[in-house]
Regions:
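Cytoplasmic helix-loop-helix junction between adjacent transmembrane helices
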Residues: 111-150
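A membrane-interface helix-boundary motif in multi-pass transporters
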Residues: 48, 164-177, 367-391
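Short amphipathic helix-loop junctions that connect adjacent transmembrane helices
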Residues: 34-51, 241-258
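Helix-to-loop junctions at the C-terminal end of transmembrane segments
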Residues: 67-80, 272-286
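Multi-pass alpha-helical transporter architecture, strongest
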Residues: 183-189, 387-409
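Conserved MFS/SLC helix-loop-helix module at the cytosolic interface between two early adjacent transmembrane helices
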Residues: 66-105
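C-terminal transmembrane helical hairpin of 12-TM major facilitator-type secondary transporters
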Residues: 287-330
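Juxtamembrane intracellular "pre-TM" segments in multi-pass secondary transporters
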Residues: 2-11, 191-228, 250
Length: 409
């Protein structure tokens, strides 16, 4: 029997999932510090045009994720988590290779489409976590998963910024090596976590994005939680979508400074998720913890909308760490409303919602920023995206307060 056939309680199961999510996050964040100047160099574009190109790039990546996420989630329910995660890792490695070789804006966009297609592994990865943890422990474990994502946000942008001195594409070669190493690790040591009796045939109706949404619509309380998650996803995307552009337009930061700023945010959020999330959820409950996190996030968004100095920006990076309560709390609320056989589909639904939010985000956040940093704008206001994010978060808080309190299926 191969190591892959080992029991799901094998310590390699959770370890591999954490590394995979870390690499997914790193792949998402790797390009952030170098993206503005990479687009300006490759496309010979001014900053406002590069912001606009970045919006189209984000839309293409989000559309790919929107399609792929529920497919991967349902495939993981039918085939098991192991096969789907290994395929996604192979695709992630291909994505890094394309970005490393990119010599045009079109190639960069194509590389980000691959990121969207194979970044949908977040859903199957979370489903694997649900397979091997009890319902009462899931909020804490999802907090650890979110911490892995936060660490990826540290490693990705920091690596992108630090290696940018060796060229725009150097970070992608480093990430390619890491992705291939994790693929080999999973191929040999990652066990299957989904029991055969809990698998179900692949369904095209469930695998399309709107079929996944029907799952939420049919379950008590799940629809509103899904809508809250969608609003939160749109608002929280203000950082990955606009931060690098905002830092250049508002504060004149270098690629290295942008990478270090992402690293600081990632460190504070990861520490918060490890040491605060589990305790806060147990003390406050999932709903109240999510509300508290969103209130802190909205205050941070307003602060960045008005920020005019590096010192204030640095202080806000530490203060916004409380937003780490939101994602794991909402994910735990969704997971509680699904049975064991639905966990892959529910996590696919969550990933689909994130993909849909990523489609809305570039239009709602990045496009206005491109306008308010262009010569045609009546005022120069790079912080417009943060102001919009604050309003969206306030709407999410209001909607969550109306969600039924039932916590089980």
């Amino acid at each position: 029997m191969s190591p892959a056939a080992a029991d799901a309680r094998n310590p390699h199961a959770l370890r591999f999932v954490m590394i995979t999510i870390l690499l997914d996050a790193m792949g998402f964040g790797l390009i952030m510090p170098v993206l503005p100047r990479l687009l300006m160099r490759v496309g010979s574009l001014p900053l406002d045009a590069a912001i606009n190109a970045g919006a189209w790039m984000s839309l293409a990546m989000a559309a790919a994720s929107f399609i792929a996420a529920p497919v991967l989630g349902n495939l993981s329910d039918a085939l098991g988590r192991r096969k789907v995660l290994l395929i996604a890792l192979a695709g992630l490695a291909a994505n890094y290779l394309v970005l490393a070789l990119a010599g045009s804006v079109a190639m960069i966009i194509f590389g980000r489409v691959l990121t969207g297609l194979f970044g949908g592994s977040y859903g199957p990865a979370q489903a694997a976590v649900a397979d091997i943890t009890s319902p009462d422990d899931r909020a804490k474990t999802f907090g650890m998963v979110s911490a892995a994502f936060g660490i990826g946000f540290i490693a990705g942008p920091a690596l992108g910024g630090l290696l940018s001195g060796w060229g725009d594409t150097a970070p992608f070669y480093a990430a390619l090596a890491l992705a291939l190493a994790n693929f080999l690790y999973g191929l040999w040591l990652f066990p299957e976590t989904l029991k055969p009796e809990l698998r179900r045939p692949f369904s095209l109706a469930r695998a399309n994005p709107f079929g996944a949404w029907k799952t939420a619509a049919a379950s008590q309380g799940m629809r509103r939680i899904a809508l809250v998650l969608l609003l939160w996803q749109v608002a929280s995307l203000v950082y990955p979508l606009t931060w690098s552009f905002w830092a250049i337009a508002q504060l004149g930061w270098s690629d290295q400074m942008i990478g270090l700023s992402f690293a600081l945010v990632g460190i504070t959020i990861a520490l918060s998720q490890v040491f605060l999330t589990g305790r806060a959820v147990k003390r406050l409950g999932e709903r109240n913890a999510a509300q508290l996190g969103m209130i802190g996030a909205a205050a941070g968004f307003i602060g960045y909308a008005l920020c005019g100095s590096t010192l204030v920006a640095g202080l806000l990076m530490v203060a916004i760490a409380i937003q780490s309560l939101v994602q794991p709390s909402l994910m735990a609320m969704l997971s509680r409303r699904a049975d064991a056989a639905q966990q892959g589909e529910i996590q696919g639904l969550a990933a689909m919602i994130m993909g849909l939010g990523s489609i809305i985000g570039p239009v709602l956040l990045v496009k206005p920023m491109a306008w308010f940093t262009s010569p045609a704008a009546p005022i120069h206001f790079p912080g417009i995206a943060f102001a919009i994010a604050a309003l969206v978060t306030i709407g999410a808080i209001a909607l969550l307060r109306t969600t039924p309190r039932r916590e089980t299926v």
